[in-house]
Regions:
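Von Willebrand factor
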Residues: 1-16, 18-68, 71-72, 79-81, 102, 105-115, 119-121
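C-terminal helix of von Willebrand factor
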Residues: 131-167
Length: 167
């Protein structure tokens, strides 16, 4: 499966049972965090990998696949390619791809009650994607957490799955 890190579309090797211990510090060491994130570029690459016939571009009719794709999209910032991101989300609504956006920081849809009380958000664009018009189906969800570590595995799983129905 493809892996993406910041604007690097190759990204780190997948995490598994054999390399989970110390995985995150090693990834950050090999792939330092950057100041630019292009959601649209990453979404296009994911679509090209899973549904190559569309070449990451527009689709005019629904596409079927043997298995749906669940994309967990984790970010701590906004994107520099908002228009491309919106196009990718609209086009991919014809494909069996579900996008779960998780903002790490402060958001209006924060699952931390203390943060939810704030009116401002680090993720207004992600919040708008969750309700983006012009899609065949609602195939995206968004939430924010101050830190994923503040939630148990079971609670985090519940946050990740409420709108996913297997496309």
């Amino acid at each position: 499966s493809p892996r993406f890190h910041s604007s690097n579309l190759k990204g780190p090797v997948p995490m598994g049972l054999s390399n989970w211990n110390g995985y995150i510090p090693q990834v950050i060491k090999l792939h330092p965090l950057e100041g630019d994130t292009r959601y649209g570029r990453a979404m296009e690459a994911i679509r090209q990998f899973y549904v190559p016939d569309a070449a990451g571009g527009a689709r005019t009719s629904p596409h079927k696949a043997a298995l749906p794709v669940y994309v967990m999209f984790v970010t701590d910032g906004s994107t520099s390619d908002k228009s491309a991101t919106e196009k990718q989300l609209r086009w991919s609504s014809m494909e069996p791809i579900f996008w779960q956006f998780m903002g790490v920081g402060k958001g209006r849809k924060s699952k931390n009650k203390l943060l939810a009380a704030f009116q401002d958000s680090d993720f207004p664009f992600l919040e708008s994607l969750d309700e983006l018009p012009g899609r065949l189906i609602d195939h995206a969800n968004y939430f924010a957490v101050h830190s994923p570590a503040e939630h148990s595995d079971a609670a985090l799983y519940e946050l990740l799955m409420p709108e996913y129905h297997g496309c």
